[in-house]
Amino acid sequence: MSALLMTKALRQLDPQKLAKEASCITELNKRFAVAKVGGKTLVLDTFSETLDALSFRDFENMYNNVDVMMGKSSSRLGKYWLYHANRRQYLDGITFQPGNVVAQSQYNLWSGFAVEPDDTLGCSLFLEHLKTVICSGSDLQNEYFLNWLALMVQHPGRLPEVAIGLLSGQGTGKGLFMQYLGSLFGRHYKHITDKNHLLGNFSGHLHDAVLVFADELSWTGNKSDAGILKALITEPTRFMEKKFADAIQVKNCTHLIFASNETWAIPAESTD
């Protein structure tokens, strides 16, 4: 079984436990939590890659077909969980603090790295590809990039305030390099191929991004793009906004890498 299939299997809730009074709350708590999101109180689906937020009514409707048996009587699972004293909840809202412990009353969007360190293994081929291909054999570029990557891994919550640009022809391994690098971060790695998904108003999909790969984005010379991009690279906070939901401010931990086959890869000015 692949790692992806194993992960999905582990993230499934047990239908039998959901139908029992003694286990249904604990089982639903694995996936759902009540939290303050902007000015609303909603139910977070923590298994969702985009952290879907449901209204109480929508959550109840989702589980209206499940009855919790309590002796000779029963209750609808959704309503039973919502009004239970032991439901999972974060009444002080959402925060994004990679690598940090937060208050129990807050939901930390950071879920950790997707892999565990193993001192018995090496990454010599990856490092060789980084130096000879990505950095064109330059010791200076290689050292700078390695330090940039080390900061991201050792302190994922620290904003580097510098973006990396990978410029080369097709077929040089930029995408393969990013696949391996992104696998360290799991859900905190975002592969973007549309400029609007990076700079558009609705950036909820970037809510928990640590590493963002902007792959062959097309720039039109719009000056506002440069301003938004600069803020994403340098500002300590940003707004997380989804359609039909209030925007909330979260910590900006974006480590941005661009890749392009074109000479003009990003809308940067000469002084940037």
Q: Residue locations for each model-derived region?
A:
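A short helix-turn-beta junction within AAA+ P-loop NTPase domains corresponding to the substrate/partner-engaging
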Residues: 268-272
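A Trp-anchored, charged/polar loop motif used as the substrate-binding/catalytic surface
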Residues: 132, 235-239, 259
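P-loop NTPase catalytic core of nucleic-acid-dependent motor ATPases
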Residues: 96-213, 217, 225-226
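AAA+/SF3 P-loop NTPase mechanochemical coupling elements
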Residues: 202-207, 241-259
